[in-house]
Amino acid sequence: MSDIYNAPHLQRHNYKTDMSEQEKLFAKLNAKTDAESKRLQRYIAMADLSKQDGSPVKLITEKVLNLPTLKNLDIIETPEVITPELVFDLFNFPKDHPARSASDSYFLDANHVLRPHTSLMWKYYLDIPEIKKRLEENGSIGVLSFGKCYRRDEIDWQHSNILHQIDGFFVIRKDIKTLDQKDLENILVEVCEALYGKDVKYKFVVDHFPYTDPSVEMNIEMNGQMVEILGAGIAHPNVLKNLGIDPEKYNAWAFGFGSDRLAMIKQNIPDIRLLYSQDERVTKQLADLEHKFVPVSKYPPITRDISFIVDKSFDLNAYYELIREIAGSEMTEEVKLLDKYKNEAKFGKDKISYTFRTIYRSLDRTLTSEEVDTKHKKLEEVTIQKFGAVVR
């Protein structure tokens, strides 16, 4: 790997952004009693596994932060609540990008959103006066950030609305090094080989992100299935310019690893909910990063379907959120969209029929048909009330 990451001036410093505004916003949120505020309070109160002793997410994070190529990069801790202008406008998101909507992101109010990723640390890092001075004097800087993120998402073994990321950002003057995608891919491969060995099977897939161009995602094989573990790319010139960096003079790479998935692949963990388990049979296994997870006795699933007709504006992520609220993440293993179709003659204009299958299964006990039926009946009722659905 190039010596640009071990230049003498690159010596790790730790920074923490002022959190006083976040504390005020959380206090204001905690005083509210409406359903949405209560939901956000629960999500915010969930443990940040990247900082929790005994969690494989923390162990993976520490391992990545201290790899030879990354060990000299600074570390910065940033707020979990930011403004839409920071996370979207500065990072080149189009005005109609779905991430800007409440169907994809969690808004505390019109002016504050729970961070959907930790890449926003670019802004906080470059706002530190000494950082730009170091860049001007030495020609390169680099930083890592990690922590909890919030994103409305589907429900299955590898997805959660609460996730953890490890982000990296490296800026260098072009006359020292013109970065290309291969430079970035070399680092990503180094990370994966350090975690999984030289025989790890991976592939890069072209992707598109507002703040990097070109962009790529990386997939790692887990039990014969390719699992996405990150998005990465060369920093978009518009974003560098927005952050006060001359893109004619400097270039940069960036990555964002999903540390939950890194841990799941490392230990062969079959369900993302296990990362939060309090079952001693689970926690003992997760505390050893080199241990391959051995499933504890698996409780039986209970499956229920729901079919309904709704307006074409129906929001899938909002529905997944509703299921989390009604059934609870601890009971909901997976939600599958089985069928979606239009039939104007049968359902009416601008109407769509959906069929979902919910697999109910607890990690620590056997569910009864009666309690699942109660939850599922409630789901039907709220689906009708909230979305104007006609249940079939």
Give the residues covered by each predicted segment.
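Class II aminoacyl-tRNA synthetase-like tRNA-binding/catalytic domains
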Residues: 2-162, 171, 226, 231-240, ...
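Generic alpha-helical secondary structure
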Residues: 53, 57-61, 180-188, 312-320, ...
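Positively charged, Gly/Ser-enriched RNA/tRNA-binding surfaces
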Residues: 59-71, 121, 132-134, 186-191, ...
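Generic solvent-exposed, charged/amphipathic alpha-helical segments
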Residues: 61-69, 185-193, 320-324, 376-384
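Beta-rich nucleic-acid/ligand-interaction surfaces
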Residues: 75-102, 198-223, 337-346
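Conserved short secondary-structure elements within globular domains
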Residues: 139-151, 197-202, 333-340
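An acidic, glycine-/histidine-flanked metal-binding catalytic module
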Residues: 165, 169-191, 195-196, 265-289, ...
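A carboxyl-terminal module marker
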Residues: 210-223, 227-392
